[in-house]
From Swiss-Prot:
The keyword rRNA-binding applies. One of its GO terms (cellular component) is cytosolic small ribosomal subunit. One of the primary rRNA binding proteins, it binds directly to 16S rRNA where it helps nucleate assembly of the platform of the 30S subunit by binding and bridging several RNA helices of the 16S rRNA. This is Small ribosomal subunit protein uS15. The lineage of its organism: Bacteria, Pseudomonadati, Pseudomonadota, Betaproteobacteria, Burkholderiales. Keywords: Ribonucleoprotein, Ribosomal protein, RNA-binding, rRNA-binding. Disulfide bonds: none annotated. Transmembrane segments: none annotated. GO terms for biological process: translation. Pfam families: Ribosomal_S15. It comes from Bordetella petrii (strain ATCC BAA-461 / DSM 12804 / CCUG 43448). One of its GO terms (molecular function) is rRNA binding. Belongs to the universal ribosomal protein uS15 family. SUPFAM superfamilies: S15/NS1 RNA-binding domain (SSF47060). CDD domains: Ribosomal_S15p_S13e.
Length: 89
């Protein structure tokens, strides 16, 4: 399961810093969030899929590390990203 190319392009366009930017932490976090949300839906139906659950936990960990990096380097961008993605309540 992956994020469709069109959806991925929309996410990149929404969160990129400049034209052609696909590697900034904001874009990476947004793409990981989309994949995590898709997998979360998968687990509602396939509760015993432990191999995919390991991949999900790995993605969550990678997103956490990117968010920590962004929080240390650019707190304003971090807060805006959290708000936009709706990650904190």
């Amino acid at each position: 399961m992956s994020v469709a190319d069109i959806k991925k392009a929309d996410i990149v366009a929404q969160f990129q810093r400049a034209q052609g930017d696909t590697g900034s932490p904001e874009v990476q976090v947004a793409l990981l969030t989309a994949r995590i949300n898709e997998l979360t839906g998968h687990f509602k139906e396939h509760m015993k899929d432990h191999h995919s659950r390991r991949g999900l936990l790995r993605m969550v960990s990678r997103r956490r590390k990117l968010l920590d990096y962004l929080k240390g380097r650019n707190p304003d961008s971090y807060r805006a990203l959290i708000e936009k993605l709706g990650l904190r309540k």
